[in-house]
Amino acid sequence: ETPQSVKVLTREYLDDANINSFQDMLNTVTGLAANRWDERQYPTARGFEVDYYLFDSVPSTVGMDASDPDLTMYDRVELVKGANGLMTGAGNPAIAINMIRKHADSKELTGRLSTSFGSWDNYSSTVDISAPLTRDGDVRGRLVVKHETKDSFMDGYEKENNVLYGVIDADLTDSTYVSVGASYQNLERDGVRWGGLPAFYSDGTRTNFDRSKIISSDWTYWDTDTISAFATMKQKLFKDVNLNINYSYRELKQETALLYFGPSYANGGTVPNTGTVDKATNQGVGSLSTWSDRTKTTENNIDTFISAPFTLGGLQQEVVAGFMYNQSKNDTWYSGSPTLSGATIDFDDINMPLAGDISNTNLYQVPNKTTQTGAYLAGKFILLEPLKLITGVRVSNWKYESEDGVNNRKFNNEVTPYAGLVFDFLDDYSWYASYTEIFKPEDKRNVNGEYLDPRNGNSLETGLKGEFLDGQLNASLAVFKTQQDNVAEAIDNVFIPDANGDPTKEQAYRSVDGVESKGIEFELDGKITNNWDMSFGITHFSAEDAAGKKVETLASRTTANLFTKYTLDKWSVGGGVNYKSAFYTGEGSQKITQDAYALANLMVAYDIDQNIKAQLNINNLFDKKYYEGIGVNSMVYGEPRNATLTFRYQF
């Protein structure tokens, strides 16, 4: 009954497609583009950056571009396309990615053990066990443990991933439910890249490196530790009136030592005069520097609401009132060597020694805090038997504080209205439409180092939804349009200068008014027969500013995703295709384009007995060479063909 495009990535689908990490998942979502830049990915949807996420429907503003949460801890992922400001507050009209945690739902001892072997010495083992903690099963526990080690197609790259997750769910009384849990993920990556390879030879033609080549050294690393804790209480107050209280805490620690090579700019110009590669010598001259940082980000969330159903005119209605609080704190200690312009790097032997200790000199502390509160009132009303109105309003306050007081800012009493209609014109078909407004403080800065004004606008969506084959197959068709002012647009080859006026590595942006994104989306999910599962989606959109200039050109305008599986007796055979249309960055001689491409994937599974399954997954079946990310005079290659063999034992 949500008047927007909705999709659920089930645990069965995640297992079948061998999707184990957050970054892997992003590449399979219709309408979502994820431009990779070293260990980080920057997802966009409908032409706008994805800037918030949800855990058990509680919003989080702490980014996940580098921490890459492991999906072993989650039961499913729920996706709501478009603006979702009523329930989340400040944010872009892109997509709400809701990570639903696993819970202890079984009153009997159950579990699953799995082990995987894959390309580039990829080994992982997972234990997932649920059990009653009391004789009647009213108190239950679940524990998930995972260990993974992996090399890579990239020279010198190694990764180790460790996950620990536990949750206790309790039915304290017939009217009181409580859940408490915590998780820890340690992700260590050595031999990492920071940025991409040069895109051009010195004669202006495009480079063509082996996909194994990266700019890195054996002393580089990128480590993250993520700690989460949460508590939920659901209390039935009287009749059908329910109180929900949610609290969550996240702590992200990051430590890096990195090597950077990029273009140099002459006399403050915007066109690089170095950073290319000589074809004859395979050497490049450009800007070389090292970097180290230690970052700690903590976040506290409180989400509480009361839902009260009632009857009016013989029809069922519901009102929800809630309050949300979110505060994130960030502390960063960083240092690095001065940028060395005119440095030479040999792309036949990139490994470069570390000139000195970069982790204990010239440390700077930049603490800051962002606080957001919001109160909302929403209702679902049946106006006539086939016609429902979903409407609400949210009032938000947002404040950013830095210890030095620089760029402190706040916005109070920002009102976000929402309205939607759902009309069930046949038993299995409905039409819907929705409207909401948008408010988002900008975290991008202009060339003077000043934060841009908040973006604002509105989003419209209308479409059809239908059920087929006795509800086993769902289809939806949506048309959407979003208009925004004060949208941040990167200024090509312009970076924010430091105190001496020299360019840093921080991209400079400008505000653009009249940005309009519009498009169409179709999705089909479910079972065609009892043996045949199908998931298909395709999205096309355009995004331009008031002058007709394309914005967010790093996002493919058309994306399509297909995954299907057919089961016969003990065998299951399936596969998928992920398609992305062309995307580009830069202009003129500095323009870099990734042409349209499609990646094919294959899976074959066999039930050895009723408890044991073997499954083979092959990604990039035809070994397509493509750019997973592009930037200023640089690009990042995607993974070549790779395979994983998994054994699962379930009891």
Predicted regions and their residues:
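Periplasmic plug
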Residues: 1, 8-11, 22-28, 41-83
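Outer-membrane beta-barrel translocator/receptor signature
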Residues: 72-75, 86-164, 172-176, 227, ...
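Acidic/polar loop-and-plug regions of large Gram-negative outer-membrane beta-barrel proteins
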Residues: 148-152, 165-171, 175-236, 251-297, ...
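Structural signature of Gram-negative outer-membrane beta-barrels, strongest in the C-terminal barrel
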Residues: 169-171, 297, 316-328, 366-484, ...
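Face-selective signature of the C-terminal outer-membrane beta-barrel domain
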Residues: 230-252, 286-403
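Membrane-embedded beta-barrel scaffold of Gram-negative outer-membrane proteins
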Residues: 234-236, 242-248, 252-258, 431, ...
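Gram-negative outer-membrane beta-barrel transporters
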Residues: 384-386, 481, 510-588, 607-613, ...
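Outer-membrane beta-barrel "beta-signal"
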Residues: 463, 637-651
